[in-house]
Amino acid sequence: GSYETAWTWLHKLRRAMVRPDRELLAGVVEVDESFVGGRATGRQGASTDKVPVMIAVENAGTQVNRKLLLGRVRLAVADAPGSKQLVEFARTTVAPGSLIRTDGARMFRVLAQEGYTHQYVSGYSSPEPGHVTLPGPHRVASLLKRWNAGTHHYRVEREHLQYYLDEFTFRFN
């Protein structure tokens, strides 16, 4: 019983939490990216210390008390921030025929030609903050960061981050 044995078993469990044939997200799906990683206090903009994470979340509407209802979520590590990999992520996680809401990134325009209904809900120069225009991904990113800070103390290496994202997805869904 060593730390290495426990760590290895936890990673095996994290890998087992994802079904390769899981259903695609459907309905209204919000897609965005966020950054996960170590603390970068006092800096603005994209940090080189943090890892870009792609987020897709079903928006199930709002309840009577105006609280946002979220459906299932999908998370994946991105190679670089703002990459076209985000479009491929949307293709592989969202069912055709769904409404995909994104920020003003031009790369998403191709989705309208591939059987998706695409809606820009904000642009880079929008006066509305992201948590207002794309509340689903921002809520999930906030929960993910709090979970990472509280459970793992910001100590998840990039090479293992996808396993931790899979665990978070399993717990969230």
Segments predicted by a language model, with ranges:
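Residue-level recognition of single "structural anchor" positions
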Residues: 1-173
